Amino acid sequence: MWNNHGGFDGGYGGSGMGGGGGYMQSPGGFGSPAPTQGEKKSRSRSQQIVPCTVSQLLSATQNDEVFRIGEAELSQVTIVGIVRHAEKAPTNILYKVDDMTAAPMDVRQWVDTDEASCENMVVPPGSYVKVAGHLRSFQNKKSVVAFKIAPVEDMNEFVSHMLEVVHAHMAMNSQGAPSGGGSTVALSTPGRVGDSGRAFSGGNDNPTNGLTPHQSQILSLIKSCKGNEGMAFEELKNRLHGMNVNTIRQAVEFLSNEGHIYSTIDDEHYKCTDGD
């Protein structure tokens, strides 16, 4: 998972972060002493990177320092969403990442103050990202401390992530469920654009091939409008309040030039060519 970004090859299943020995070195550089055999058995799942939705993380229960979703223990997690807000401080960058399943999640990335590396670059709002990090709670507010933030170039990565969420939590709960009964984890997934006016629209009718995430998002919004006049550019701006107006305009022009959409009553109203 994430091999194409040069990130990590852990993920759920197998050996987690690739660690199979008694000492687990975390991506942030902090390790822990080798656990006993019993601790290995009881805490093995927490060493894996678990795909999650923001809704799941916010509803996770905490006992001492251990977070759980149902019977599944987790610490290292991944989420995929759009950056709604970014704020840089001398030692860290605070993001609000929205995957449309709940309120945006606080994601904090610590920066290296000694050198100007790519890790210190601020991801601008409106960008889609995949975040890997540790779930934390401070004063009853959950957040993710990120050790990896990578751009999402293809919206299929979002669909793939949601499938990984379902697979991982079904597998983990089947492993942790007591005999004679199972434990069900509610999976909150983003609604379609036509239902909620939000950004993601996972499903078979999401024509992402060859399009950037912004273009796919705008095309899905236009396709969701069933009126004869189509969707007005002003409405697009209102729906996409986190996206730059010039970015929206450029995406609309591209979609029009490529034949994905066409203008209707004027140059500010658009319909999808295969929306019927």
Curated annotation (Swiss-Prot):
Superkingdom of the source species: Eukaryota
Pfam families with a match to the protein in the record: RPA_C
Compositionally biased region (Gly residues): 19-31
Coiled-coil boundaries: none
Keyword tags: DNA damage, DNA recombination, DNA repair, DNA replication, DNA-binding, Nucleus, Phosphoprotein
One term under GO cellular component: DNA replication factor A complex
Name listed for the protein in its UniProt record: Replication protein A 32 kDa subunit-A
Originating species: Xenopus laevis (African clawed frog)
